[in-house]
């Protein structure tokens, strides 16, 4: 009996088609999803098992289609190592803000009544950020390429970062204003306060967008632009007007994350639109989710201040969304 001798495969042979030495990003990011190898049975279980049926319906049969999702590249080419280096610097900056402003007794100098606005309009944001975290994690799990999943998992970590900042700031304010209800009534506000109900409805419904493409579009092309333009930026403006100089700086750090999310979302849309059929699919999902997002923004802005004209912020959300869709 003789055995045919085969030439051993090179390291990272699955990247050979690139015809160049793979970068660190390529090595740790590309073609890592083995669940895409067999469309009839994504996972090594019965093809009719609940998990396989889920992936076949909500990933493989998604109307958002491309012949090679693995060709998508994160424009920032972040990996776990570089992400941690970058965010370690950001977290050091945020912690230094907390320390310095605490030493200056900043919270005692805000305009009277601002603490109640923060209790009502800021501290419940941690529920919204947790929704963003869960939604990003779902897209990460369902995405058809590991380069997409990597972007989503880092976005998930960013959402946890935002949530942590909000919880920390809430407790810090409660030490100066123990009677403002900070850290005590956020769940009740999230569930019952009229100004939060649009956001709660939006996110509870968005978390049931099981198709991976619809989940991505509704989250990154509808929800997140609305949060940037109709929550973060109005909060910054209101904070400045109420002598709160810490919150705008904190939000600036979070907006850096949001800008990165917009960059990779824009790159993924550009990649998806290599298939012309995807244009109508993406536009259809945006039109489905935009009314909910607009109503959520209007309710929140009306709660934040009676002097705010929601229309201008909705227009900015539309402009940000359009910039992501422009390829």
Swiss-Prot record:
Instruction: Please tell me which top-level EC class this enzyme sits in.
Output: oxidoreductase
The record's Gene3D superfamilies line, in alphabetical order, gives: Ribonucleotide Reductase, subunit A
Q: Which UniProt keywords apply?
A: Aromatic hydrocarbons catabolism, Monooxygenase, NAD, Oxidoreductase
Q: Name one GO molecular function term.
A: toluene 4-monooxygenase activity
UniProt keyword Endoplasmic reticulum, yes or no = no
Extract the signal peptide range: none
Kindly report the pH dependence of this protein's activity: Optimum pH is 6.8.
List this protein's GO terms for biological process: toluene catabolic process
Entry keyword Oxidoreductase: yes
State what the entry records as the consequence of deleting this gene: Cells lacking this gene show a complete loss of toluene-4-monooxygenase activity.
Activity regulation (record text): Inhibited by Zn(2+) and Cu(2+).
Which reaction is recorded as catalysed by this protein?
A: toluene + NADH + O2 + H(+) = 4-methylphenol + NAD(+) + H2O
Question: EC?
Answer: 1.14.13.236
Q: Which InterPro entries match?
A: Ferritin-like_SF, MP_mOase_hydro, Phenol_Hydrox, RNR-like
Q: In which pathway does it act?
A: Xenobiotic degradation; toluene degradation
Family matches, as CDD domains: AAMH_B
**Quaternary data:** The alkene monooxygenase multicomponent enzyme system is composed of an electron transfer component and a monooxygenase component interacting with the effector protein TmoD. The electron transfer component is composed of a ferredoxin reductase (TmoF) and a ferredoxin (TmoC), and the monooxygenase component is formed by a heterohexamer (dimer of heterotrimers) of two alpha subunits (TmoA), two beta subunits (TmoE) and two gamma subunits (TmoB).
UniProt function note? Component of the toluene-4-monooxygenase multicomponent enzyme system which catalyzes the O2- and NADH-dependent hydroxylation of toluene to form p-cresol. Also able to convert benzene to phenol, catechol, and 1,2,3-trihydroxybenzene by successive hydroxylations.
The family line of this record is: Belongs to the TmoE/XamoE family.
Name it: Toluene-4-monooxygenase system, hydroxylase component subunit beta
Biological source species: Ectopseudomonas mendocina
């Amino acid at each position: 009996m003789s055995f045919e001798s085969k030439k051993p495969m090179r390291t990272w042979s699955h990247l050979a088609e690139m015809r160049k030495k793979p970068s660190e990003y390529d090595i740790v990011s590309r073609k890592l999803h083995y669940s895409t190898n067999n469309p009839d049975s994504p996972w090594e279980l019965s093809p009719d098992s609940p998990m396989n049926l889920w992936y076949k319906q909500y990933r493989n049969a998604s109307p958002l289609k491309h012949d090679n999702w693995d060709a998508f590249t994160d424009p920032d080419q972040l990996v776990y190592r570089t992400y941690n280096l970058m965010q370690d610097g950001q977290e050091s900056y945020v912690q230094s803000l907390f320390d310095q402003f605490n030493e200056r007794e900043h919270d005692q100098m805000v305009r009277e009544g601002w603490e109640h606005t923060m209790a009502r309009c800021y501290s419940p944001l941690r529920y919204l950020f947790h929704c963003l975290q869960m939604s990003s994690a779902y897209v990460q799990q369902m995405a058809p390429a590991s380069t997409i999943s990597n972007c989503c998992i880092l976005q998930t970590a960013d959402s946890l970062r935002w949530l942590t900042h909000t919880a920390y700031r809430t407790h810090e304010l409660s030490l100066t204003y123990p009677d403002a209800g900070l850290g005590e009534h956020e769940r009740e506000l999230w569930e019952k306060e009229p100004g939060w109900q649009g956001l709660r409805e939006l996110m509870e419904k968005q978390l049931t967008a099981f198709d991976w493409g619809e989940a991505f579009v509704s989250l990154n092309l509808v929800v997140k632009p609305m949060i940037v333009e109709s929550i973060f930026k109005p909060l910054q403006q209101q904070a400045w007007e109420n002598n709160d100089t810490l919150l705008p700086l904190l939000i600036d750090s979070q907006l850096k994350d949001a800008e990165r999310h917009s960059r990779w979302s824009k790159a993924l849309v550009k990649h998806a639109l290599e298939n012309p059929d995807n244009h109508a699919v993406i536009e259809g999902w945006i039109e489905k989710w935009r009314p909910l997002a607009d109503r959520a923004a209007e309710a929140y802005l009306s709660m934040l201040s009676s002097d705010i004209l929601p229309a201008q912020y909705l227009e900015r959300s539309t402009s940000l969304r359009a910039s992501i869709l422009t390829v």
